[in-house]
């Protein structure tokens, strides 16, 4: 494993093409005009978009082409592009000016390449058709989960973690999270003034399917009066008690921040019905804010409204932190490819970026520890 490096520190120059694992992944005559040490690498972005994706692509292309002389091929719309043979060569010119842009120039989708029988063979065939030496896969738990399975089947893959939810277990932080928290905090700050002016409660629904990191951090930063997260089923009676306590103290408004995946203690209030599911089997979440609005108003008699931040958390320009972290992940990924360190993922561990195995990266989700949520409780009510 290479030595760790800080967010502003480049790795020592690896010797391209010398790794035995790289050599093993390329059969003789794999592609016409092959030059030892020069690779042809595919890159894709899968799952929900988030700020910082373009910074990763830019770093992969800039260092891959400028420093190593590799050819970089981008697949359109994630794994769908691999299955549908939708690819284009990425050049230095094609990544100019994309650093501050949100979204992804490659497009994305929630396509599961292994959903149907024959998916593995289709991926292998596409790599052969494009004469690729390997793939850099940028994604969250589902996209990287598919990458880990492909890697275990012998497909040469290096991963880059991406999710605004910050819930990948293999890394301390994912890019996009910082931007999402800033967007949510700005919204909470604005909603405070209108809530106070009209003496009403406001429920702010933020993203977070399995983990409440966005809700917790934006709620703390925005001075929320109640924060509800997926890791801790909530008691609606306790939520109402906290709001009533504020009113008894002359504070005739409250901000309730709730993650979309938060659920009540079983049997304490109505819940959402079955939602449609994506190709990875996850339900499309959303709606807990509206249910809370109804329950709080009907139980307390206080006017309550809901604001669902939704996809605004994914959009727009990334923060400086996310640009730097995404850039370092991209640089680490192209180094890993050049060194033949297949089956790994760039990860932030403490202050430094290093490589972890894909298997380790997707083994478990990174959720909010109970003690961290309990510490925040001192600000509730």
Each language-model region and where it sits:
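Short Gly/Thr/Asp-enriched flexible loops that form oxyanion-binding sites at enzyme active sites
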Residues: 55-60, 141-155, 215
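Glycine-rich oxoanion-binding loops at beta->alpha junctions
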Residues: 22-34, 82-137, 142-143, 175-186, ...
